[in-house]
């Protein structure tokens, strides 16, 4: 029999259901929008031109299928606050241990990259402010947001997300206005013919087209975060399906809509690779402070990602601590405890302290290169965790716990393996680009060695 949930109650693990439906729905919308769209759209367009839209749609489709798999399992057991628990449950403690620690470490390095980005954006306005001070201040502020109450986290994330959404909608509206008025630009006139004239599927060769997949894939990274938040809503079984079902339309509106608007305004061949297309477009319509505006938007986007990372790392570390009750270190640090507000506060604080190490890493000679390598490697490990999640879903569908009247993934026998193949394809793509090649090797070594160790440890 399925479990019933009521507003304001605690989950089985003691966490308070403090998030509201509007929080999760906006997190679901904004969670797919990272700084990459605002800053990296010019670079991705330079690789393959208008066919980048196909890359975004294909990648988005497979990420949606993964979310359907995660959503189906979370719908069956809404008390699970992390999808990693299903890997433990259906693939064994060895792979669960591997996934738990790998995911936490990957998120920590993601947090380090985000806090570094935050300081870079702030220094554009205050160049003499030391980066480490900026990082510590932002980390302390966002840690407090996560420690007060889950409702406070949801409210802050709601407004962070709103800023990103309004900016993209403003770009799309600007594009529609410029096309309908035949607006004159330095490259001619705004028109949809800028996209269709001389269209080629592979304008820079098929290798560049393939390389674009790994870049776009990581633009969607952490899309699974919405699944983590639903367990702390009042009605997870009501909120989760709606949040996941609307992912495709959000991808079309925000990613495809923004890219079409940019290419209609400005021929993609003439877009500056190292400058945000958003800045270029807004400056064209007379917004002189466009660069400052977009810097503010990407600052809030990076802060939003860091906020979500602290939320997620704290809950995953709390879960790891609960599953390793014999760990002397974790017991001493009380990482498996909750605050009076039902928050894994000690796990959040510990994760924040580890992320804070990045404030000092970048000032040490030679260490920053190693940090960049590890960060690149963690991205490859992310793919391995996604694959294990899909394998866990296959096992779930064959288990006695399968819920036929739940939020079922359609045609799973075909679409689940197809999604796994796509993730493997993206992993292979990491070896095709010089900037990700070494990281891909590092990820492969980690997956093999830590995977063997994790399974050996739990086979004794």
Feature map (PLM): residue ranges:
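Membrane-interface loop-to-helix entry segments
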Residues: 119, 132-190, 217-221, 244-248, ...
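TM-loop-TM module centered on a large, flexible mid-protein loop between adjacent transmembrane helices
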Residues: 85-88, 92, 124, 243-307, ...
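C-terminal membrane-solvent junction of multi-pass transporters and transport-like membrane proteins
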Residues: 160, 333-345, 383-434
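Membrane-interface "cap" regions at the ends of multi-pass membrane proteins
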Residues: 1-42, 46-51, 63-68, 79-80, ...
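Helix-loop-helix connectors at the membrane interface of multi-pass transporters/channels
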Residues: 4-8, 88, 115-135, 167, ...
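Extracellular loop-to-transmembrane helix junctions
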Residues: 16, 39-134, 138, 247-252, ...
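Membrane-helix boundary/coupling elements in multi-pass transport proteins
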Residues: 79, 102-117, 220, 225-233, ...
